[in-house]
Amino acid sequence: MDRSANIPISLQATENKNDLFCTSHEINTYPLGHLLLMETAGKERERITELITQLALRGSFNLIAGDEWPPDRDTLTRSIRRYTVEVEETLDRPSLRRPMTCLQLLDLLMEVDMQRRPTLILNFFHHFYDADVDLSLRDRILEQCCQYLKRLSISNSIVVLVPRVSTVDYQRFFPILAAVANEIIPVEETYEIEVSQGLLF
């Protein structure tokens, strides 16, 4: 059976059974771009580090860290060194941005729109959970962010990771983001495949 990592072709490095979030889905050649939404169980730090490594081996891409945690340079160095001796060159390929508010996230998406590169976004909803910001404003900014994500996906592959949490806000926000995605992989499917096929770490 053909087993491929469920990462869009334009973001995908060489096939490897240890690639992040391998699934039984067959990967098609997506037209121009693709918006993939993936739920995760918590932060998934080791797996996300591996995903960033695989994308960096493939080429340059935008990396937007929604929360305070992207892997540090030492962690990425150790991960990349397992695959290539061109460590410094590979480390420079992710263009890391760290918005501090949902408004800054919107600004970053507008900037990324002009760069024409694949984009990986970690913990997309993080700043939308800020209760100090009026909910109606968060709703409005989220709608605008989703519009820009959809626009970005016309010409580039976009991967958005969202840790699933049992909150009212998550249940409110997730359908808005899901409505613009080309493909959604829920956390249950990821773990069913991990248990049944051993395709994940």
Where in this protein do the model-derived segments appear?
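Conserved nucleotide-binding/hydrolysis micro-motifs of P-loop NTPases
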Residues: 69-71, 100, 126-127, 165-167
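Phosphate-binding/switch loop-helix module in NTP-utilizing enzymes
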Residues: 99-151
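Phosphate-binding/switch region of NTP-binding enzymes
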Residues: 152-201
